């Protein structure tokens, strides 16, 4: 059976049957479809609202709050930006501030993860 045939057959299922199929696949392979489905829904929503809009390629990482471990956040900001101690401290104290701008999505997510790992609140724009 080809993948195309399988997809067509699955497309003929009722919602109840499709739900049962998902449950059976989850049990058989020991996985959960919930996170993947949520990501798909979230990714599909903007496309439905503005189909002509292109996917964003440049992102800004904005520090919204330093959290409990301000010293560690300052250290990470210094490492990421190359700023001096005073400049990094001023940036963290003045939150919300942009830490990095015009960077790729992968790099922005990496920067955001590093900041979140030390307790900072971060936003990608």
Curated annotation (Swiss-Prot):
**A biological process (GO) annotation for this entry?**
translation
Q: Which GO terms describe its cellular component?
A: cytosolic large ribosomal subunit
Q: Which InterPro entries match?
A: Ribosomal_bL12 (IPR000206), Ribosomal_bL12_C (IPR013823), Ribosomal_bL12_C/ClpS-like (IPR014719), Ribosomal_bL12_oligo (IPR008932), Ribosomal_bL12_oligo_N_sf (IPR036235)
Its keywords, alphabetically, are: Ribonucleoprotein, Ribosomal protein
Read off the Gene3D superfamilies from this record: 3.30.1390.10, Single helix bin
Ribosomal protein found in the keyword field: yes
UniProt GO MF annotations: mRNA binding; structural constituent of ribosome
Q: Does the keyword Ribosomal protein apply?
A: yes
Q: Which family does it belong to?
A: Belongs to the bacterial ribosomal protein bL12 family.
Family annotation (PANTHER family):
39S RIBOSOMAL PROTEIN L12, LARGE RIBOSOMAL SUBUNIT PROTEIN BL12M
Please name the NCBIfam families in this protein's record.
L12
Subunit notes for this chain? Homodimer. Part of the ribosomal stalk of the 50S ribosomal subunit. Forms a multimeric L10(L12)X complex, where L10 forms an elongated spine to which 2 to 4 L12 dimers bind in a sequential fashion. Binds GTP-bound translation factors.
The free-text function statement in the UniProt record for this protein reads: Forms part of the ribosomal stalk which helps the ribosome interact with GTP-bound translation factors. Is thus essential for accurate translation.
What is this protein identified as?
Large ribosomal subunit protein bL12
Source species, please? Chlorobium phaeobacteroides (strain DSM 266 / SMG 266 / 2430)
Q: What is the lineage of its organism?
A: Bacteria, Pseudomonadati, Chlorobiota, Chlorobiia, Chlorobiales
């Amino acid at each position: 059976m080809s993948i195309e045939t399988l997809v067509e057959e699955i497309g003929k299922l009722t919602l109840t049957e499709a739900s049962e199929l998902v449950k059976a696949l989850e049990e058989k392979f020991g996985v959960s479809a919930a996170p993947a489905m949520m990501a798909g829904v979230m990714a599909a929503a903007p496309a439905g609202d503005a189909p002509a809009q292109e996917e964003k390629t440049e992102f800004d990482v904005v520090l919204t709050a330093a959290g409990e471990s301000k010293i560690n956040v300052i250290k990470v900001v210094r490492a990421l930006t190359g700023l001096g101690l005073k400049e990094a401290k001023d940036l963290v104290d003045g939150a919300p501030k942009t830490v990095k701008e015009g960077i790729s999505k992968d790099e922005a997510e990496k920067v955001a993860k590093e900041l979140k790992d030390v307790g900072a609140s971060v936003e990608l724009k």
